[in-house]
Amino acid sequence: MNFYGHAGQWLMMDCGITFNSPLCTEAESKTSALQKHDVVAADPWFISQRKEQLAGIVITHAHEDHIGALPYLWRRFKCPVYTTKYTAEILRRKLSRGGLGDNIPIIEIGSGERVNIGEFNVEWISITHSLPEAHAFVIRTSAGSIFHTADWKIDPAPVTDKPFNAHPFKLLGKQNI
């Protein structure tokens, strides 16, 4: 969970989970079954106090550490979720198991598109990762622009999706972003 604030509004990037500790120690892995451990999410207190100013939630890609907390925390925020078609489908399946079904407004955005989310203009830039449709972002405001990325790798021959394309990132460098 990352936040960007501008002109009285907030933009959330990702809403994931992680695990409290390894599923098993090295010694246990040879002798016992995997142990259960707590799932951990970021503390949403800060943004819960400002939920009326939360313009939207942008999801970078479909891994649990980026979408896993959304079924549990969205009820606090009740704002649109912006992501790609692939991640949206994974998220919809996850939400239907959590009883939210079609209650969450999920807006599908394509690679290279720019979308206004409140005071933020967000551009989706394709990035290589271990699953389809992972993205980095340029977030533009009247105060300036920033580059946001989550997980990525420079991969000329990925197993899924398209090879890494350096061109958009070189253009950002020329724009001093």
Language model feature labels by segment:
Residues M1-V58, H63-I177:
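His/Asp/Glu-rich metal-coordinating catalytic cores
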